[in-house]
């Protein structure tokens, strides 16, 4: 079952990032990375063609209250997003959780920023929101995302085919991470590995 989420008043700091709610003033930064070919495509959406397209999606981030802006501490620039999306992972109904989805500006790839952000959100979801689990996935062609998932401690749950915003069904893998405080018996946790 999808746990309730509202990140409007949440602020999480890591060594190099601030995770916070999106603001209308983030539009230029958002468009700057979302318009780059290959960035959105790794997450299943087409790169943005206009500032207006980015504005519509930014408005949905703000009203949806489930997506963090990733702000680079060094200069205050928004360089990515991390959302807590609803997903039917096929886990028992009594368990509460969400799926982590993320995108990072190509200029910041290869610096270990996304594992840093994901770890902070895992801690927040398990310690503050008391989620039972989180899921996270990647498309087969996205090795960078696979490495983030693996570094973050997720375990393979199942192979999936996802209908993307690009109108394409993409094969991939879905992983799960159980809250270690609530679920200590690993033998009873549904996983493939």
Language-model features: locations:
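Acyl-donor (CoA/ACP) binding surface of acyl/acetyltransferases
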Residues: 1-41, 67, 71-193
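Conserved GNAT-fold acetyl-CoA-binding loop/helix
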Residues: 38-59
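Soluble sensory domains of the PAS superfamily and closely related sensory modules
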Residues: 61-63
């Amino acid at each position: 079952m999808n746990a309730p989420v509202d990140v409007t008043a949440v602020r999480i700091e890591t060594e190099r990032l601030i995770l916070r709610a999106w603001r209308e003033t983030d539009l230029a930064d958002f468009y700057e990375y979302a318009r780059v070919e290959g960035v959105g495509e790794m997450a299943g959406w087409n790169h943005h063609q206009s500032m207006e397209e980015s504005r519509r999606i930014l408005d949905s981030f703000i009203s949806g209250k489930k997506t963090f802006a990733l702000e680079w501490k060094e200069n205050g620039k928004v360089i990515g997003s991390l959302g807590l999306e609803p997903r039917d992972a096929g886990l028992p109904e009594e368990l509460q959780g969400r799926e982590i989805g993320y995108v990072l500006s190509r200029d910041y790839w290869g610096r270990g920023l996304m594992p840093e952000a994901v770890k902070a959100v895992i801690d927040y979801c398990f310690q503050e929101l008391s989620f039972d689990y989180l899921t996270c996935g990647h498309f087969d062609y996205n090795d960078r995302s696979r490495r983030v998932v693996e570094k973050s401690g997720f375990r393979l749950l199942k192979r999936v085919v996802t209908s993307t915003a690009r109108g394409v069904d993409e094969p991939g893998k879905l992983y799960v991470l159980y809250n270690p405080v609530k679920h200590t018996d690993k033998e009873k946790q549904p996983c493939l590995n």
